[in-house]
């Protein structure tokens, strides 16, 4: 009971820190700029994250190092948070003025609803799984602990990576918040979900720029995000692609606005956002390349004071990127820094023709695997697992249906309409007609491996959420389109969101066994003895329980003395293997598992309880939220009643 109360308190403190530190410092800096309220909201959030990263990274690099596994100086992080609170107090009148904007209020309420929706989903999840996805969620937790607990530089990362294989910004940000609460995985989940949901803000900012409605509404975009399997999976799965997409979409807005208004500050903000996105995830690289080329070839030579603007772009971006790359080169060397990413390592391992690989990956990212080759992951005891994995592959790794069953085709239809007719925004739509295919081709080209299931989830998430924004900008939809979108949302939520969370809620209870592992004496390894879902789902479960299971079987073997010498040798080898597994806690995690009693708990585990009965509550809540949101969307789709003009009384003719 005390632990549950402490977790609730820590979650409340975490949300307060996320709200204050995620907006106040950046908004204080931009509050007096001649920007729109939405630009101040989104730009303030983006700049706040950059400033927090710089502060946390400076603390990590400059504070005195203690023993491996010791937490970074918490007091320094508290000071940074207090400064954020102070800046928020100084800007309170401007914040009040910002919230007086009706559009900002609707966006803030929409984000709050999406955060509630996502936390309810996290309260369901007890084991990450889906298709062939494995381990990334645990890897990013270890990376955050790396910066929080000052792991030695030579600490290996799970999945066989080195630290420079992925950029650090989101992991450093999460470490900043964990340092002021606790290094629990449940808090890591909520902090990651909050940061990943931020991409909703620049998508709302982009709505007017899409040119389909003079006053675009926010509710349709809220519904499309909540019902999107891709958005919700990337929000609940604790990796970093969605936060990178936040910076990329924000950069698109500031780039177009700076180009249209000849505004040097907005143009510099666009490339600073791209640099931040690259520090979150290298999937922002294609967008940095293409926007940089477009600026140099199409925009730069026509800009007033172009060299001063170029300096205003290059210097801040170079300084921001140097915080990571200069440090990594100094610690790991240039070879590890630039050649340990998955794009480089997988490209080296691929033996075939690169052009053929790019073409095949592009085709497979457009045509779903289930339509090309039939069902996969079919050898599962649970039919819901088979359906979930095939639906997961249909949505998550596909460029078209990643925007929804009906949303993807509708986006293609809307884009085709813009191509056919001359748009009023003649300056911007040619930009999109060029950028979209280039981003798709380059985004697939940088994928190192050959993936027959599709590669859209690696680099194309910014385009997918912009596609959802395009659908929302077209609201109110025509009758046929409205029926298709609503029906598609029902299918997307049922099969892509709710079913996914429902299968991820499956875990062992006193009345049901979903996963189990037994010791193979000959190999000395733990192997599945019962698995209701796919092999990858079992691997994700095993990665959480491997230390506890190793301790359990090591204790069982302590008194095991078989009469057969061969069996004794096998038992001795098994004990040695189990000890090697336990030694990985010190090697990879610097004793984190031991300090936490070899237990990693999901937020869904805390809600479900030991009996598992509590798991029903968030499922019921998610259905209620779905009905409420769908009802609000249907009410929004009703045609407005005609306004009745006041009738003038008949004029009296004067009698003569």
In which residue ranges do the predicted regions lie?
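Membrane-lumen/periplasm interface segments of specific transmembrane helices
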Residues: 309-392
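Perimembrane helix-loop-helix junctions
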Residues: 254-257, 261-265, 287-318, 326
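Transmembrane-helix motifs of polytopic, lipid-linked glycan transferases
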Residues: 24-28, 80-93, 186-212, 250
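Hydrophobic, aromatic-rich transmembrane alpha-helices
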Residues: 24-31, 296, 379-428, 467-470, ...
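Short acidic/glycine- and proline-prone juxtamembrane loop motifs at membrane-interface regions
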Residues: 230-244, 282
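Membrane-embedded, hydrophobic transmembrane alpha-helices
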Residues: 1-105, 397, 581-640, 655-656
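Membrane-interface alpha helices of multi-pass inner-membrane proteins
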Residues: 60, 222, 266-282, 288-292
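Signature aromatic-anchored transmembrane alpha helix within multi-pass, membrane-resident enzymes
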Residues: 110-111, 272, 292-293, 314-318, ...
């Amino acid at each position: 009971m005390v632990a549950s109360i402490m977790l609730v308190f820590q979650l409340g403190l975490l949300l307060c820190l996320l709200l204050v530190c995620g907006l106040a410092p950046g908004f204080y800096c931009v509050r007096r700029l001649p920007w729109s309220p939405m630009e101040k909201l989104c730009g303030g959030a983006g700049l706040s994250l950059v400033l927090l990263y710089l502060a946390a990274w400076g603390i990590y690099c400059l504070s005195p190092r203690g023993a491996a596994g010791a937490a970074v100086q918490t007091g320094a992080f508290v000071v940074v948070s207090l400064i954020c609170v102070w800046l928020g107090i100084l800007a309170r009148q401007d914040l009040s003025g910002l919230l007086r904007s009706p559009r900002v209020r609707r966006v803030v309420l929409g984000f709050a609803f999406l955060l509630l929706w996502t936390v309810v989903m996290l309260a369901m999840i007890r084991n990450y799984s889906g298709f062939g996805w494995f381990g990334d969620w645990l890897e990013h937790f270890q990376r955050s602990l790396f910066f929080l607990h000052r792991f030695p530089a030579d600490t290996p990362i799970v999945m066989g990576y080195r630290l420079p294989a992925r950029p650090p910004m989101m992991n450093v940000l999460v470490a900043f918040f964990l340092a002021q609460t606790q290094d629990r995985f449940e808090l890591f989940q909520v902090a990651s979900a909050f940061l990943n949901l931020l991409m909703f803000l620049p998508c709302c900012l982009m709505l007017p720029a899409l040119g389909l409605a003079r006053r675009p509404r926010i509710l349709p975009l809220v519904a499309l995000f909540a019902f999107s399997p891709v958005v919700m999976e990337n929000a609940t799965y604790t990796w970093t692609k969605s936060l990178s997409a936040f910076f990329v979409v924000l950069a698109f807005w500031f780039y177009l606005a700076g180009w249209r208004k000849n505004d040097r500050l907005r143009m510099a903000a666009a490339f600073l956002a791209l640099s931040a996105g690259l520090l979150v995830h290298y999937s922002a690289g294609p967008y940095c390349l293409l926007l940089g080329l477009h600026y140099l070839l199409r925009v730069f030579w026509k800009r007033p004071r172009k060299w001063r603007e170029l300096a205003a772009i290059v210097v801040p971006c170079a300084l921001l990127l140097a915080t990571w790359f200069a440090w990594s080169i100094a610690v790991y060397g240039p070879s590890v820094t630039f050649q340990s990413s998955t794009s480089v390592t997988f490209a080296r391992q691929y033996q075939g023709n690169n052009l053929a690989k790019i073409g095949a990956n592009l085709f497979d990212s457009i045509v779903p695997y289930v339509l090309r080759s039939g069902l996969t992951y079919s050898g599962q005891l649970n039919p819901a697992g088979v359906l979930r994995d095939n639906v997961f592959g249909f949505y998550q790794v596909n460029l078209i249906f990643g925007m929804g069953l009906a949303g993807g085709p509708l986006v293609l239809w809307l884009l085709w309409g813009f191509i056919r007719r001359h748009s009023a925004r003649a300056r911007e739509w040619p930009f999109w007609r060029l950028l979209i295919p280039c981003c798709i081709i380059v985004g697939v080209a940088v994928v190192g491996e050959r993936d027959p299931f599709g590669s859209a989830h690696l680099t194309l998430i910014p385009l997918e959420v912009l596609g959802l924004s395009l659908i929302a900008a077209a609201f109110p939809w025509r009758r046929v389109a409205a029926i298709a979108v609503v029906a598609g949302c029902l299918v997307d939520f049922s099969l892509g969101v709710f079913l996914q969370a429902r299968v991820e809620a499956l875990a062992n209870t006193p009345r049901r066994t979903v996963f189990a592992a037994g010791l193979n004496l000959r190999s000395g390894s733990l192997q599945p003895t019962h698995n209701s879902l796919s092999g990858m789902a079992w691997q994700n479960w095993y990665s959480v329980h491997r230390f506890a299971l190793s301790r359990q079987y090591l204790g069982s073997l302590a008194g095991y003395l078989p009469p057969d010498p061969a069996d004794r040798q096998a038992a001795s080898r098994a004990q040695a293997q189990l000890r090697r597994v336990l030694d990985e806690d010190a090697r990879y995690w610097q004793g984190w598992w031991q300090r936490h009693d070899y237990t990693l708990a999901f937020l869904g585990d805390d809600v479900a309880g030991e009996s598992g009965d509590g798991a029903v509550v968030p499922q019921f809540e998610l259905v209620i939220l779905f009905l409420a949101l769908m009802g609000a969307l249907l009410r929004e789709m009703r045609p407005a009643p005609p306004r009745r003009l006041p009738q003038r009384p008949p004029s009296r003719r004067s009698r003569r």
